[in-house]
């Protein structure tokens, strides 16, 4: 695993955390928007669970053989969910006047970083795909602090995805700590 891929993944995690906490939670208060936000929240949850796998495994595990194909499918699925999210946001955010301008810029930067990460990850994926099928413990050649930071990010993004899924299901107290006028 290249160190560049790990650093780009960390940058993606930092920008993604900012996007989630500032735009999705604070500004748009998506979990409190009820049924109107459910489609967007479901997409966010799906992406979050994929990112939890990436953050939790890439710093530690080599995806050999068929597992390299599974990893490639996860990477492509994230792109598909992101594209669907772009379309879904238009209807969900209509009552807010659209997606915030800064949020659009944030999403563009995240797309660029993700693309760069995939580009530097492709040689490893190619090598891994030629190996016998196995998930092998192979800590990335980066500082241990970075590997453990990515594990913390895996936990954080998993919790965020669970929150979004909980809110999309409109379960009790899913809007905490927010309240909004849902008639907006």
Language-model features and meaning:
Residues 170-184:
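Short, highly charged, low-complexity non-transmembrane loops/tails of multi-pass membrane proteins
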């Amino acid at each position: 695993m290249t160190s560049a891929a790990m650093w780009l993944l960390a940058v993606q995690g930092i920008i993604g955390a900012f996007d989630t906490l500032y735009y999705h939670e604070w500004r748009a208060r998506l979990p409190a928007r009820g049924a109107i936000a459910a489609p967007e929240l479901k997409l966010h949850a799906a992406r979050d669970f994929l990112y939890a796998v990436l953050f939790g495994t890439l710093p530690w595990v080599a995806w050999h053989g068929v597992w390299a194909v599974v990893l490639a499918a996860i990477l492509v699925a994230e792109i598909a969910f992101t594209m669907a999210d772009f379309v879904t946001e238009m209807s969900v955010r209509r009552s807010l006047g659209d997606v915030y301008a800064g949020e659009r810029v944030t999403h563009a930067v995240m797309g660029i970083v993700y693309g760069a990460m995939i580009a530097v990850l492709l040689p490893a994926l190619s090598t891994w795909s030629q190996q016998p099928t196995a998930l092998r413990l192979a800590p990335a050649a980066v500082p241990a602090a970075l590997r453990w930071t990515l594990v913390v990010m895996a936990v954080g993004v998993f919790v965020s995805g669970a929150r979004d899924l909980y809110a999309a299901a409109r379960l009790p107290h899913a809007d905490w700590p927010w309240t909004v006028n849902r008639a907006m």
